[in-house]
UniProtKB/Swiss-Prot annotation:
Protein name listed in UniProt: sn-1-specific diacylglycerol lipase ABHD11
Alphabetical keyword list: Hydrolase, Mitochondrion, Transit peptide
Pfam families (UniProt xref): Abhydrolase_1 (PF00561)
Top-rank taxon: Eukaryota
PTM comment: Phosphorylated.
Amino acid sequence: MSNFAMSALCRVFTRGAPCGLSSCSSVTGLRDFCSGVSRLDRAGSDSMRTASPVNLTYDVFDGKGDSTPLVFLHGLFGSKSNFHSIAKSLVQRTGRKVLTIDARNHGKSPHSPVLTYDTMTSDLTHLLGQLHIGKCVLIGHSMGGKVAMTTALSQPNLVERLVVVDISPSLTSAHTNFHAYIQAMKEVKIPSDIPRSTARRLAEDQLRKIVKERSVRQFLLTNLEEQNGQYGWRINLESISNHLEDILGFPEFDTTYEGPTLFLGGSSSAYISSDDYPEIQRLFPCADIQYIPDASHWIHADKPLDFISSIITFLQP
């Protein structure tokens, strides 16, 4: 039985890097649910350990303009809905078509035992081909940022511009104890046939022991789903757990992406540090690095207006 388990910017200060590298300063087998929350079945799940692309679920927000579409890629534990309000605003303000996509093992996309940047890039390019999108602006947050970078470096002709949100092309240090989050989610126990509000409260109470920040608990709880009275995590916790080192890492590249690139970090986040600048310059020689004040890792949630303004400014010729 297959399983389904869960932004004005401050002034920019030049760092003296190529192409204006700069930064700003100040600144988510049903069995006995009483013995643990299972990961409910997802139709279309992969049963083979294969690099074959899966058919990703996505939402389209149509704009009236003919400019290159924007494609949003969410982070670990996230889903396409994380960017819905951002997408709607960008459609209104730019006229561009905007897509938000669920990665494999996330949201409503199929489950697979394989979760690497190669496979996630393959999924994305497969979808773009299906939709006859020959070029796009890729905007990826965290894990999605690494998928966006991998795509730009391996298939640059597909990417007109690149926005990488609060992540770098390197090993992600243990800023967050993802292993503990996954284990805490696996250990959540919820009885069947109870109201969703009650189930959510019970799950949050159990997560609170490990996940101290309420905002993070609320984010993880967006993955709690009910089917036929049974509650489970829609993300594939097993695959995420098995591939966490792959997700925290980044593939090696000798190629570069020469297109316009924006690395957008939160000033209160440690995911893009000065230690990462040399590798960013090497792989993305025309990159700008900017920070949004008072924003954490979840920039788009903390400072949505600043986040949107940053993207619109970056899109201007």
